[in-house]
A protein has these predicted regions:
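Sec-dependent N-terminal signal peptides
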Residues: 4-14
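Acidic, serine/threonine-rich low-complexity disordered tracts
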Residues: 20-116, 158-258
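Short polybasic amphipathic segments
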Residues: 119-127, 169
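Sec/Tat signal peptide C-region and signal peptidase I cleavage site
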Residues: 15-19
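Intrinsically disordered, low-complexity regions enriched in acidic/Ser/Thr/Pro/Gln residues
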Residues: 144-147
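Acidic/charged, solvent-exposed loop-and-adjacent secondary-structure segments enriched in E/D, K/R, S/T
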Residues: 126-141
Length: 258
């Protein structure tokens, strides 16, 4: 039972770090996730990101994230979580966001559409075999979803901030809008996956829930170059801690990690 909860918490943590499309991927990022088991880090899952041109909205992109447990854990507890966001390619404002969570016998879907003319977000929440409900949330300005906010953060001009500056962000999470922030922690030279390079480091304020402790319990290392790759994420969760490290990245410009 302890392993089940550890795995569920781990992949939930990584996702807060590929369907067929007629468009080729603009960018693909593949992460291996690790759970801190006492004094060692245990490989437990993967998270794959794929960014393509949206087929549903003009001047928009479609970002898909898939998190799944490794076969060595599947016989204990299987996780297959999928998140999809369609957002404006310049402002990162979302048009549509969905999450399909399949964790053991737990199956739940979240589907949101953002209606800017009416200033509302409409949600369809479905717990398979249990309930289905619709939510209407008042849409506030500059509200991101769980995926679009990650791509927006990659474009922040961190060079204009001082260490410990707070950058406000607003996110829709489970039918509620939260005013949070990113704390900028400065530039460090880090060795990640055997490679040293300069990184911007920042810590987002987290909402406490089934996975995360509330507060500044996550750190993100972003490459200080033209690609702004999220190289590593570390977070404390309710039981232990998790880490996701970028294994592979590619785009129409080539493989950044070679």
């Amino acid at each position: 039972m302890k392993k089940i909860w550890i795995l569920r918490l781990f992949l939930g943590g990584c996702l807060s770090l590929c369907a067929q499309s007629k468009y080729p991927p603009i960018e693909e990022l593949v992460y291996t996730g690790y759970y801190n088991w006492g004094f060692i880090w245990v490989k437990a899952g993967r998270v794959d990101f794929s960014l393509t041109t949206s087929e549903k909205y003009p001047n928009a992109e479609r970002l898909k994230a898939v998190g799944y447990s490794l076969p060595s854990w599947d016989w204990i507890f299987t996780i297959r979580d999928t998140l999809i966001s369609h957002f404006d390619k310049n402002t990162f404002m979302p048009y549509e966001f969905s999450r399909k969570a399949h964790e053991g016998n737990y199956h739940k879907t979240f589907d949101y559409t953002f209606h800017y003319d009416d200033s509302v977000v409409l949600g369809d929440i479905h717990r398979i075999g249990k309930f289905r409900r619709t939510d209407t949330v008042k849409l506030l300005g500059q509200t991101y979803d769980m995926l679009s906010v990650a791509w927006m953060a990659r474009e922040l001009d961190f060079d204009k901030y001082q260490k410990n500056d707070l950058i406000p962000i607003r996110i829709l999470i489970d039918s509620k809008i939260y005013d949070l922030y990113i704390r900028y922690l400065g530039v460090v030279k880090s060795k990640i996956a055997g490679r040293k390079q300069e990184c911007y480091v920042f810590s987002p304020l987290l909402v406490e829930g089934e996975v995360f402790k509330g507060g500044e319990n996550m750190k993100i290392w972003l490459s200080k170059d033209e690609y702004r790759l999220p190289l590593m994420v570390e977070a404390k969760i309710l039981v232990g801690s998790v880490k996701a490290i970028l294994d592979r990245s590619a785009s129409k410009y080539g493989d950044f990690t070679e």
